Amino acid sequence: MLRRSLVTACVVVPGVLSAQQPTVSDSIHPHGDTLTHAIELQEITVTAAPTRREDPQAVITVTPTVISRTPATDAWDLVRQTAGVEVHLQGQGPGFAPTVSVRGFSSDHSTDMALWVDGVPINEPVNGHAEGYNDWNVLMPGAIEQMEVIKGPSNAKYGNFALAGAVNVRTIDRMHGIQGSVEAGSYGRVDANFLGGFDQAHWGGALALRYQRDGGWRPNSEYEVGQGNLRYVRDLSPSVTLDAGVGVHLTDWASPGYITADQFAAGQYDTVANTTDGGFKRRGQERVSLRVLANPNLLWRTTAYATQGRWQLYLTIPPEGGAGEGSGGQTEEEDTRYGLGLTSALTWALSRGQVTAGVEGRYDHSDYEKYFTTDRARDSVDTDLAAQQVSGGAFAQADLDPIPHLRVSIGGRYDALGTSTTPVGGLEVSDSKGIFSPKLGALVHLKHLVSLYANVSRGFRQTDGVIRDPSLPFITEWAYEAGTKLDGKKWNASVALFRADVSNEQSFDPITAVSTSGGQSRRQGVDLDLRIQPSPALGLTTAWTFTDAKYQQLITEDGDTLSGARIFNTARYVGTAAIDITPPKTTVFLRLATNVVGPYTPFDLPGVELPAYALVHLTGGIRFGSLLLQAGVRNLFDQKYPELRAGDFVSPGQPISGFGTVRYVW
């Protein structure tokens, strides 16, 4: 069924148009956004992902070299291994968006993190499952050219849902050659990829295709994924560039459901809540971008996009309150949506810096239905409504060097959102609101190797439940950051102290979908990042975040006071570390990496703290001419860990698994 859907989508979707995504620091250059790929298997070397050094904020750039050397299974896995960001899977299929945790923000389905791909926002407003639903699964690792991870809300180019920060992804737009790869692994995993393209100086393109099938390590957890990403770029003149493309994501999955904490402790992972649980997702996006260099100092860029999607989920929800309490039962959720958007920005190059000013607008429509079901047969209606949102924003960002060794960034944005919802057979309810978010930062170079920086900014996001009650207020934060960046010839490091004061804090149980909002919280801590490359044959990287995250004032629907308690699902520390080894003058490489999650309080269990755990992954490879062979083991020591825990229920993490990959380049 999925294979037929993928073929149909590729045939009926016309030659659709795609956009270029502005980077955090947009420089004016006639071909500054046209990144050319030549697929060559040269002598393997190690290159660490650098931290952006010139910005008064914490930004990590994941480069093409790093991407090509990282054995990531999916886009979220790529971020987890390269950017010091912790990711937790929901464990119920690839249509379930994972939870990204950054600086103590770990909301359900990554709704505190803004994700942009080629100028298109991925977060979904007016989503009945989770407001700002952010599905990393729609990204193809093999199609990614570059990725920037921006911690905190300090950049004016990102508005709604950027409480924890933003991730800006640019896909490959043109390249030379063709490559194909096939991966086989434990539990019946097969992952086939194709990447090819052309580059004729003033025009080019790239096509990426992926088919993935996995039998699942738990009963009733098999899935299929089909993806495609096509881009076409043409220089209409020396100063005008057109970028066109389309992306398609199709997936079907079965869900094993959650198990109790006692079953998890006993290793009883084979329990299946309901063999009819599962779902599907279909998503497409089209975009067109025009880039005009009006003069050597003025760049204009505009992007128009459209998105379409349908998502259906059958999932047995455990009884509220814990095992054995209440009846629980299966529910069906269905979300059918479409959206349109436009962004436009001007960048002026000055003698001492640059200024960017722009506007953006989008329209999103969602038909959301939720039913109580028995083995997929509908018993009664919980929710049936149509919702729409019109939003607009204006932003300006100036990055100036008023004197030598000093960078000042000042900016701000204003966002206005109008949301309306109409239950079937009911009356329309609507509300409009706006918010201004100032941004200010500075960086000073004390010496060639040392920089100090600080910033203060405001961020916001919409609250879960807006699709039913548009009058709900924004979740807002004031964020503060101060740090240092250190640079050497073969190493770089950064240390950042951060604090975020959040108003209208929300606690959301991802299993029961019960939310509590209206309180306050504070997140504060330190980020540490170190990357050492003593030789082309050896690379060492590590990134850690230590967080003290507590509710300052919050009362749940049950009347429990959470003031002073740790914020749910927020670890005291998270960290990553990796060693990359390549013997000199060989085509062999070895990578040993670990992800560490410190103690944390699960959802709806204040005062309870789960123990820390660490996952270790080992990967190696060798090249023979145009052939690259790669093999590895994930969760090398078979660590037992929970991907998600809420109350008495657990989604267990995957045990040890192996894989092997064959890649060939033409």
Model regions and ranges:
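Conserved C-terminal beta-signal and adjacent last beta-strands/turns
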Residues: 8, 247, 396-398, 454, ...
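N-terminal periplasmic "start-of-domain" segments of outer-membrane beta-barrel proteins
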Residues: 38-76, 95-99, 229
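Extracytoplasmic beta-strand/coil segments of soluble accessory domains associated
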Residues: 76, 80-124
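Short acidic/polar hinge/loop motifs at secondary-structure boundaries
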Residues: 120-151, 169-170, 230, 471
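Short strand-turn segments of transmembrane beta-barrel domains in outer membranes
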Residues: 154-156, 165-198, 209, 214-218, ...
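Transmembrane beta-barrel wall of Gram-negative outer-membrane proteins
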Residues: 186-213, 218-256, 278-299, 350, ...
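Membrane-embedded beta-barrel scaffold of Gram-negative outer-membrane proteins
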Residues: 194, 299-317, 445, 451-457, ...
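Gram-negative outer-membrane beta-barrel transporters
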Residues: 403-408, 417, 499, 517-604, ...
